[in-house]
Regions:
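Outer-membrane beta-barrel pore domains
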Residues: 28, 136, 190-192, 214, ...
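Outer membrane beta-barrel
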Residues: 97-262, 282-299, 306-314, 374-394, ...
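Bacterial N-terminal signal peptides
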Residues: 10-22
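N-terminal periplasmic/intermembrane-space "pro-region" immediately following the signal or transit peptide
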Residues: 25-122, 267, 300-303, 473, ...
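Bacterial N-terminal signal peptides that target proteins for export
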Residues: 2-12
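Interfacial loop-to-helix transition and helix-capping segments at the boundaries
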Residues: 275-283, 337-339
Length: 478
């Protein structure tokens, strides 16, 4: 074998070895590369999960930070509002509250003090006609019959309440003198204390607890005003003390006062027919009034007014009252005017319907030396029904007077028909009525006040069926 052959064989062996080594080495390098790539992917995935977790943590921290920041801002705002409210309250008092809740009010935050502010305005048109040959037949015009503010509430605690009604109105609404002036005056002005066992005590000027017509407030009457009978035979206002006991179905009123003015039983009323009177003025030796009411059905609150709106529940009330007073001497030896009276009334309320009836009797002694007695009687019957939700028709008949002709007469017989338009309940109301007297209206005689009353539109009349009155009234109450 020559050298060339040896070199050729050697080259072939080397090439074969290199080829085989390459073939066996290549799979090992690829596997290593794949393993390296897999490791890198695992590292990238791990890094990605780490970054995702970090992002989630950052989001949570950011939301928490925003929530806390918002809460801090709200806290700061609340503190500023409270500080401003405290600053305002410090100017008006300690914790003063105010607003509207069935009327304007001011109150302390602890509830010990409260002042309610209300009012009443009654703008009235009257047209009167009397068939007469000697006096003005037609008489009428506009007037502000009542304009007053009402202040009520409680002081120190809810057991001590008060009411003050002051404004402009007739100084002699009961035609005691008569006095036709409209000027500044008081209506009710009293302080009331709640006692134990359902009792309460009221001191001041108030309506004596006798007839129900008198006890229903001016703004809650059915017609333009109370009946002519009630203004004469009701007891009107006086000053004194009243004890009240209230149960679920029974109420009792007991009053000791300076007496009733309506039958001229209080000498002081001859110069000042509107209480209060000075303590040393002549009024009465003593005066006592008692009234008991029995709630036969319904609620007490139903009978604070004479109407019963559609949808109201049925209610019945019966009341009975007595009154007695002993007059003071007025310089005439042996003449002390005494007076006793009794009344009873029945009220029925239902769904848009009402009915009311009352009867009253008074006896007076020693009006004049030649007139030992005066006997007064009066009857009132009225009813109403709603024609629409805001329109109510009513009718009333009132009759009575004094039985002795020497003191006047008992020939008052007034039939009244009318309409109520409740524009906004009793708060804004228009009332129109027409009354015709089938009898006579006495102007009074021998110390008797008679039955005429200019505030109600009725003038003295000596002829039968000779007088009528038309009245329209706009009422604003709050």
């Amino acid at each position: 074998m020559n050298n060339i052959a040896k070199h050729a064989i050697t080259m072939a062996v080397v090439v074969s070895a290199l080829f085989c080594g390459t073939l066996f080495a290549q799979p090992i390098d690829i596997q290593e590369q794949l393993d390296a790539l897999r490791q890198r992917l695992d590292d990238v995935q791990s890094d990605t999960e780490g970054m995702r977790n970090e992002l989630d943590e950052l989001k949570v921290e950011e939301l928490d930070w925003l929530t806390k920041e918002r809460a801090d801002e709200i806290r700061v705002l609340v503190r500023e509002v409270l500080a401003d409210a405290d600053a305002r309250n410090s100017l008006a008092g300690d914790g003063l509250l105010g607003g509207w809740s069935d009327g304007f009010f001011l109150a302390s935050s602890d509830g010990r003090f409260k002042l309610n502010i209300g009012g009443l305005m009654q703008q009235r048109f009257l047209q009167n006609f009397v068939r007469s040959d000697v006096q003005d037949r037609w008489r009428g015009g506009l007037e502000s019959t009542r304009t007053r503010l009402n202040f009520s509430g409680h002081v120190f605690d809810k057991d001590t309440t008060f009411l003050v009604q002051a404004g402009y109105g007739y100084l002699d609404p009961n035609a005691v003198l008569p006095n036709f002036r409209i000027a500044d005056r008081l209506w009710d002005a009293w302080i009331k204390f709640k006692l134990d066992g359902g009792w309460s005590a009221k001191l001041g000027v108030f309506m004596l607890p006798f007839t129900r017509e008198s006890l229903v407030s001016d703004e809650y009457q059915l017609a333009v005003d109370r009946s002519l009978i009630d203004y004469r035979l009701g007891l009107a206002r006086s000053q004194g003390v009243e004890f009240t006991w209230a149960g679920d179905a029974t109420r009792v009123f007991l009053a000791m006062s300076n007496g009733s003015i309506t039958l001229r039983g209080v000498p002081a009323s001859q110069t000042n027919p509107t209480p209060p009177w000075a303590s040393l003025q002549q009024d009465v030796e003593w005066s006592f009034t008692a009234r008991t009411e029995f709630l036969l059905e319904g609620r007490w609150g139903q009978f604070n007014q004479f109407t019963s709106p559609p949808g109201s529940e049925r209610g019945m009330l019966w009341g009975v009252a007595v009154h007695a007073q002993n007059g003071e001497r007025t310089g005439r030896v042996g003449l002390k005017q005494d007076q006793v009276g009794i009344t009873s009334d029945f009220s029925f309320h239902s769904d848009g319907v009402t009915f009311f009836a009352s009867g009253t009797f008074h006896n007076q002694k020693n009006l004049r030396a030649t007139i030992p007695n005066g006997d007064w009687v009066g009857y009132v019957v009225q009813a109403s029904t709603y024609m629409t939700d805001k329109t109510e028709y009513f009718v009333r008949f009132a009759s009575g007077g004094v039985l002795q002709d020497s003191l006047g007469n008992d020939d008052v017989n007034i039939l009244t028909n009318g309409i109520n338009w409740y524009l906004d309940g009793q708060g804004l109301k228009v009332t129109s009525d027409f009354g015709w007297n089938f009898g006579e209206i006495s102007g009074g005689a021998n110390g008797s006040p008679g039955m005429a009353n200019s505030m109600l539109g009725w003038r003295p009349q000596i002829k039968q069926s000779a007088q009528w009155v038309f009245r329209t009234q706009l009422q604003l109450a709050f």
